[in-house]
Regions:
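Conserved non-catalytic scaffold segment of RNase H-like nuclease domains
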Residues: 1-112, 125-126
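A short, structured active-site edge motif that brings together acidic residues
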Residues: 111-120
Length: 127
């Protein structure tokens, strides 16, 4: 069982890492299975947040207007995540947005990722 990892969750302006932007990133670092640190920031996407996304996330244009842009926050995000295993629900979604932002700076990123959605599907289908 993995006891050291970073759990992440993103909110975005849509589903495509090519066409949409990150608007919030939250992460919690675990050591020995216990939370030891957290990181959370709103991100200014530089574009209008669609009304539907505001309905889903509660995040609107005013909330992100003074938030940092993803380019200004990437170093802090990656410093927090480090080389840890990434854990999240449908984590491939979050992973592709982060990797896409890094690729825009010619930074390759690969880390082990554990998707709790896959575990949930297995558990639920077994019952």
């Amino acid at each position: 069982m993995i006891k050291d990892f970073v759990a992440i969750d993103l909110e975005t302006t849509g589903l495509s890492p090519y066409d949409n932007k990150i608007i919030e990133l939250g992460a919690v670092r675990y050591r020995d299975g216990k939370p030891v640190d957290q990181y959370n920031t709103l991100i200014n996407p530089g574009v209008h947040i669609p009304e539907r996304i505001t309905e889903i996330t509660g995040i609107d244009d005013d909330m992100v207007s003074k938030a940092p842009y993803i380019d200004d926050e990437l170093d802090r995000i990656m410093e927090f995540i480090g080389n840890d295993v990434i854990l999240g629900h449908n984590v491939i979604f979050d992973y592709t947005f982060i990797a896409g932002a890094l690729a825009g700076h010619s930074i390759e990123y690969s880390a082990e990722a554990i998707d709790t959605l896959k575990f949930a599907k297995k558990v639920l289908s077994a019952n």
